[in-house]
A protein has these predicted regions:
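N-terminal leader/auxiliary helical segments
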Residues: 1-230
Length: 230
Protein backbone atom coordinates (compact mmCIF):
# COMPACT_ATOMS: atom_id res chain seq x y z
CA UNK A 1 0.00 0.00 0.00
CA UNK A 2 1.16 3.60 -0.42
CA UNK A 3 3.04 5.19 2.47
CA UNK A 4 1.14 7.50 4.80
CA UNK A 5 2.97 10.47 3.23
CA UNK A 6 1.69 9.56 -0.23
CA UNK A 7 -1.78 9.29 1.29
CA UNK A 8 -1.47 12.74 2.85
CA UNK A 9 -0.15 14.11 -0.46
CA UNK A 10 -3.21 12.77 -2.24
CA UNK A 11 -5.42 14.28 0.46
CA UNK A 12 -3.74 17.65 0.02
CA UNK A 13 -4.35 17.60 -3.73
CA UNK A 14 -7.98 16.56 -3.24
CA UNK A 15 -8.42 19.37 -0.73
CA UNK A 16 -7.19 21.87 -3.31
CA UNK A 17 -9.87 20.64 -5.73
CA UNK A 18 -12.74 20.54 -3.21
CA UNK A 19 -14.88 23.46 -2.04
CA UNK A 20 -13.01 25.42 0.62
CA UNK A 21 -12.99 23.92 4.11
CA UNK A 22 -12.22 25.67 7.38
CA UNK A 23 -9.20 24.63 9.45
CA UNK A 24 -11.13 22.18 11.60
CA UNK A 25 -12.73 20.51 8.60
CA UNK A 26 -9.33 20.20 6.92
CA UNK A 27 -7.92 18.61 10.07
CA UNK A 28 -10.77 16.08 10.12
CA UNK A 29 -10.23 15.32 6.43
CA UNK A 30 -6.51 14.64 6.92
CA UNK A 31 -7.18 12.57 10.04
CA UNK A 32 -9.66 10.41 8.16
CA UNK A 33 -7.15 10.02 5.37
CA UNK A 34 -4.42 8.46 7.51
CA UNK A 35 -6.19 6.90 10.50
CA UNK A 36 -6.77 3.52 8.82
CA UNK A 37 -3.01 2.91 8.92
CA UNK A 38 -2.68 3.89 12.59
CA UNK A 39 -3.84 0.47 13.84
CA UNK A 40 -2.23 -2.84 14.72
CA UNK A 41 -4.62 -4.95 12.65
CA UNK A 42 -5.62 -3.47 9.28
CA UNK A 43 -8.09 -6.18 8.31
CA UNK A 44 -11.19 -4.20 9.19
CA UNK A 45 -9.81 -0.67 9.04
CA UNK A 46 -9.06 -1.35 5.37
CA UNK A 47 -12.31 -3.19 4.67
CA UNK A 48 -10.63 -6.32 3.36
CA UNK A 49 -13.41 -8.83 2.77
CA UNK A 50 -13.11 -12.61 3.02
CA UNK A 51 -12.47 -12.96 -0.72
CA UNK A 52 -9.38 -10.76 -0.69
CA UNK A 53 -8.00 -11.33 2.81
CA UNK A 54 -6.09 -14.53 2.03
CA UNK A 55 -4.39 -12.93 -0.99
CA UNK A 56 -1.23 -10.84 -1.15
CA UNK A 57 -3.08 -8.24 -3.22
CA UNK A 58 -5.69 -7.12 -0.70
CA UNK A 59 -8.06 -4.65 -2.29
CA UNK A 60 -10.33 -2.62 0.01
CA UNK A 61 -13.99 -3.43 -0.50
CA UNK A 62 -15.18 0.08 -1.38
CA UNK A 63 -18.81 -1.02 -1.61
CA UNK A 64 -18.64 -2.42 1.93
CA UNK A 65 -17.39 0.93 3.22
CA UNK A 66 -20.07 2.84 1.32
CA UNK A 67 -22.80 0.54 2.59
CA UNK A 68 -21.77 1.36 6.15
CA UNK A 69 -20.80 5.03 5.86
CA UNK A 70 -21.91 6.29 2.47
CA UNK A 71 -24.67 8.39 4.01
CA UNK A 72 -21.96 10.49 5.68
CA UNK A 73 -19.56 10.68 2.73
CA UNK A 74 -19.80 14.46 2.51
CA UNK A 75 -18.43 14.81 6.05
CA UNK A 76 -14.71 15.68 5.86
CA UNK A 77 -13.54 12.82 8.10
CA UNK A 78 -15.53 10.16 6.23
CA UNK A 79 -14.52 11.52 2.82
CA UNK A 80 -10.88 11.53 3.92
CA UNK A 81 -11.19 7.91 5.05
CA UNK A 82 -12.73 6.94 1.72
CA UNK A 83 -9.89 8.73 -0.07
CA UNK A 84 -7.43 6.48 1.77
CA UNK A 85 -9.23 3.32 0.67
CA UNK A 86 -9.58 4.57 -2.90
CA UNK A 87 -5.86 5.30 -3.19
CA UNK A 88 -5.05 1.85 -1.82
CA UNK A 89 -7.38 0.30 -4.40
CA UNK A 90 -5.93 2.33 -7.27
CA UNK A 91 -2.38 1.65 -6.10
CA UNK A 92 -2.98 -2.08 -6.48
CA UNK A 93 -4.94 -1.84 -9.72
CA UNK A 94 -3.00 0.91 -11.49
CA UNK A 95 0.52 0.45 -10.12
CA UNK A 96 1.10 -3.03 -8.70
CA UNK A 97 -0.68 -4.74 -11.57
CA UNK A 98 1.44 -2.86 -14.10
CA UNK A 99 4.81 -3.40 -12.45
CA UNK A 100 4.81 -6.51 -10.22
CA UNK A 101 4.19 -10.23 -10.62
CA UNK A 102 4.09 -12.76 -7.78
CA UNK A 103 5.24 -16.39 -7.73
CA UNK A 104 5.34 -19.38 -5.39
CA UNK A 105 8.38 -21.43 -4.43
CA UNK A 106 8.24 -23.26 -7.78
CA UNK A 107 8.20 -19.87 -9.53
CA UNK A 108 4.67 -20.38 -10.78
CA UNK A 109 2.18 -17.46 -10.69
CA UNK A 110 0.68 -17.16 -7.20
CA UNK A 111 -1.94 -14.99 -5.49
CA UNK A 112 -2.21 -16.41 -1.96
CA UNK A 113 -0.58 -14.35 0.78
CA UNK A 114 1.09 -17.30 2.52
CA UNK A 115 2.30 -18.91 -0.71
CA UNK A 116 3.97 -15.99 -2.51
CA UNK A 117 7.73 -16.54 -2.37
CA UNK A 118 9.13 -14.38 -5.17
CA UNK A 119 8.32 -10.95 -6.63
CA UNK A 120 9.21 -9.90 -10.17
CA UNK A 121 9.62 -6.22 -11.10
CA UNK A 122 8.70 -6.25 -14.77
CA UNK A 123 10.59 -3.23 -16.09
CA UNK A 124 13.76 -4.29 -14.25
CA UNK A 125 13.38 -7.91 -15.40
CA UNK A 126 14.46 -8.80 -11.89
CA UNK A 127 13.16 -11.50 -9.53
CA UNK A 128 13.42 -10.92 -5.76
CA UNK A 129 12.91 -13.11 -2.76
CA UNK A 130 9.69 -11.86 -1.17
CA UNK A 131 11.22 -11.12 2.23
CA UNK A 132 14.08 -9.22 0.64
CA UNK A 133 11.75 -7.32 -1.69
CA UNK A 134 9.48 -6.07 1.10
CA UNK A 135 12.39 -4.71 3.13
CA UNK A 136 14.16 -1.47 3.94
CA UNK A 137 16.65 -2.24 1.18
CA UNK A 138 14.07 -2.23 -1.61
CA UNK A 139 10.30 -1.64 -1.34
CA UNK A 140 10.00 -0.05 2.10
CA UNK A 141 13.37 1.61 1.70
CA UNK A 142 11.94 3.48 -1.27
CA UNK A 143 9.18 4.80 0.99
CA UNK A 144 11.83 6.17 3.34
CA UNK A 145 13.71 7.66 0.41
CA UNK A 146 10.69 9.52 -0.96
CA UNK A 147 8.73 10.49 2.17
CA UNK A 148 10.45 13.85 2.55
CA UNK A 149 10.13 14.52 -1.19
CA UNK A 150 6.36 14.04 -1.12
CA UNK A 151 5.98 15.94 2.16
CA UNK A 152 7.79 18.95 0.72
CA UNK A 153 6.32 18.78 -2.78
CA UNK A 154 2.73 18.70 -1.55
CA UNK A 155 3.26 20.61 1.70
CA UNK A 156 1.38 17.90 3.57
CA UNK A 157 -0.57 18.65 6.73
CA UNK A 158 -0.24 16.21 9.63
CA UNK A 159 -3.53 16.08 11.56
CA UNK A 160 -4.00 16.57 15.29
CA UNK A 161 -6.65 15.21 17.67
CA UNK A 162 -8.03 18.52 18.89
CA UNK A 163 -11.79 18.15 18.38
CA UNK A 164 -14.81 19.16 20.40
CA UNK A 165 -17.38 16.63 21.63
CA UNK A 166 -19.65 17.00 18.61
CA UNK A 167 -16.75 16.52 16.20
CA UNK A 168 -15.57 13.45 18.10
CA UNK A 169 -19.04 12.00 17.77
CA UNK A 170 -18.73 12.25 13.99
CA UNK A 171 -15.24 10.79 14.00
CA UNK A 172 -16.14 7.83 16.18
CA UNK A 173 -18.99 6.85 13.89
CA UNK A 174 -16.37 4.84 11.97
CA UNK A 175 -16.12 2.06 14.52
CA UNK A 176 -13.21 0.09 13.02
CA UNK A 177 -10.53 2.30 14.61
CA UNK A 178 -8.78 1.28 17.85
CA UNK A 179 -8.60 4.61 19.68
CA UNK A 180 -6.58 3.09 22.52
CA UNK A 181 -3.72 2.57 20.05
CA UNK A 182 -4.14 5.14 17.27
CA UNK A 183 -2.99 8.31 19.14
CA UNK A 184 0.33 6.73 20.08
CA UNK A 185 0.84 5.48 16.53
CA UNK A 186 0.14 8.97 15.20
CA UNK A 187 2.75 10.52 17.49
CA UNK A 188 5.40 8.03 16.37
CA UNK A 189 4.55 8.60 12.73
CA UNK A 190 4.63 12.37 13.11
CA UNK A 191 8.08 12.19 14.72
CA UNK A 192 9.37 9.96 11.90
CA UNK A 193 8.11 12.36 9.26
CA UNK A 194 9.62 15.37 11.02
CA UNK A 195 12.97 13.61 11.16
CA UNK A 196 12.82 12.65 7.47
CA UNK A 197 11.99 16.21 6.40
CA UNK A 198 14.67 17.71 8.67
CA UNK A 199 17.52 15.72 7.11
CA UNK A 200 16.32 15.91 3.49
CA UNK A 201 17.79 18.35 1.00
CA UNK A 202 14.97 20.44 -0.50
CA UNK A 203 14.39 19.92 -4.21
CA UNK A 204 16.41 16.72 -4.46
CA UNK A 205 14.70 13.99 -6.50
CA UNK A 206 14.98 10.69 -4.59
CA UNK A 207 16.86 7.87 -6.26
CA UNK A 208 14.45 4.94 -6.01
CA UNK A 209 15.23 1.24 -6.33
CA UNK A 210 11.77 -0.14 -7.12
CA UNK A 211 9.20 2.58 -7.70
CA UNK A 212 8.74 4.94 -10.65
CA UNK A 213 8.27 8.38 -9.11
CA UNK A 214 6.35 10.11 -11.95
CA UNK A 215 3.81 7.28 -12.00
CA UNK A 216 3.22 7.64 -8.26
CA UNK A 217 2.71 11.38 -8.71
CA UNK A 218 0.23 10.68 -11.50
CA UNK A 219 -1.58 8.19 -9.28
CA UNK A 220 -1.91 10.90 -6.62
CA UNK A 221 -3.46 13.26 -9.18
CA UNK A 222 -5.89 10.72 -10.64
CA UNK A 223 -7.12 9.61 -7.22
CA UNK A 224 -7.39 13.14 -5.83
CA UNK A 225 -9.55 14.12 -8.78
CA UNK A 226 -11.91 11.19 -8.15
CA UNK A 227 -12.16 12.11 -4.47
CA UNK A 228 -13.04 15.69 -5.37
CA UNK A 229 -15.76 14.50 -7.75
CA UNK A 230 -17.63 12.46 -5.14
Amino acid sequence: MPSYVIHLSCAKRALEMLPEMNAQEQNAFFLGNMIADMCRDKHYTHFWNNVTYDKLVRRPDLDWFLQKYGDALQEPYVRGYYAHLLLDYNFLDLYWDRHFRFYNAQKQPEVLYDAVTFVEVLELQQMYDRQEFFSKKWYYGDYDRMNAYFANRYNVMFPNLEFNAKEWERIRRITEIDWDYAPEAMERTKAQLSQSVAIAEPGIIPQLQIFVLPELEQLVEVTAKKVAEI
